[in-house]
Amino acid sequence: MTKIIFMGTPAFSVPILEQLASTYDVIAVVTQPDRPVGRKRILTPPPVKKAALELAIPVFQPEKLRTSSELNELIALEADLLVTAAYGQILPNSLLESPKHGAINVHASLLPEYRGGAPVHYALLDGKTETGVTIMYMVEKLDAGDMISQRKIPITEADNTGTMFDKLSKLGAELLMDTLPDFLAGKITAIAQDPEKVTFARNISREQEKIDWTQPGRTIFNQIRGLSPWPVAYTTLEEKPFKIWEATYDDTKVEGEPGTILMDKTSLKIIAGDGTLIVPTVIQPAGKPKMDVHSFMSGAGRNLSKSTRFGE
């Protein structure tokens, strides 16, 4: 049976690991160290570690794999194949070249578009109507290896980064399992990425999280769904942060300054730069838990006036 080392960290990687383990001999799992999570900073294992332990697979958690003692241990396992999916570290050539069949990665974009750590976010932020998964060879340069297989999936108006993560995770697992038999048999010729079509999906900055109400409504709508459920787009209300977790887009055009609110007893609409409307559905005022807009308008939202503007 083919011996595989799997490397991954977030929930995205779990279905891929589980599918691999159902058919192949996963001899080791490498993931990031446990990290403090939440306000109480509780030390929490990555989702992949939890899944690996349930599957009784040995787990390695080096802080920096390149300089760790675990690197030589992994090379000594003499795996047939290394598979990664959102692991989170650049791997050294000594490891990439050690398995018989090399090292491959499951990446959540249609490469060469969106190399980097936030491909799903950027597909939503840019208003794409489709994205997908690419399986490619691992090289030391970020997401630059030759492509082995690729599969597309639509992005709907109702999708956000969270829903697309779930869909792409399942798609990645399916594509990997469909690809591996021919790949291991040497029947697939990989295709080089077109350097002229390369784009990057760098980690989201704090500046990208803040809503600029002078932007067109469609741009703001894509920002909100592209940053949900993490890190969440925000604006300000009376100079305090106000997160918008979920919203819809209304292309009806109205007169008014960007950021101006239109409201009734149960709903809230905000005028964007082109006069179209953002309709928040799930929000989080400063110091409060997230809530639906109806609950907000039945409480603190009753104090808003039509002269109130977001972002001031």
UniProtKB/Swiss-Prot annotation:
Enzymatic class: transferase
InterPro entries: Fmt, Formyl_trans_C, Formyl_transf_N, Formyl_transf_N_sf, Formyl_transferase-like_C_sf, GART_AS, Met-tRNA-FMT_C, Met-tRNA-FMT_N
Domain of life: Bacteria
Alphabetical list of CDD domains matching this protein: FMT_core_Met-tRNA-FMT_N (cd08646), Met_tRNA_FMT_C (cd08704)
Catalytic reaction annotation: L-methionyl-tRNA(fMet) + (6R)-10-formyltetrahydrofolate = N-formyl-L-methionyl-tRNA(fMet) + (6S)-5,6,7,8-tetrahydrofolate + H(+)
PROSITE patterns reported in the protein's UniProt record: GART (PS00373)
Residues that bind (6S)-5,6,7,8-tetrahydrofolate: 109-112
Keywords: Protein biosynthesis, Transferase
Gene Ontology CC terms, in alphabetical order: cytosol
GO molecular function: methionyl-tRNA formyltransferase activity
Annotated EC: 2.1.2.9
PANTHER family reported for this sequence: METHIONYL-TRNA FORMYLTRANSFERASE, METHIONYL-TRNA FORMYLTRANSFERASE, MITOCHONDRIAL
Task of the protein: Attaches a formyl group to the free amino group of methionyl-tRNA(fMet). The formyl group appears to play a dual role in the initiator identity of N-formylmethionyl-tRNA by promoting its recognition by IF2 and preventing the misappropriation of this tRNA by the elongation apparatus.
Family the entry assigns: Belongs to the Fmt family.
Protein name, entry field: Methionyl-tRNA formyltransferase
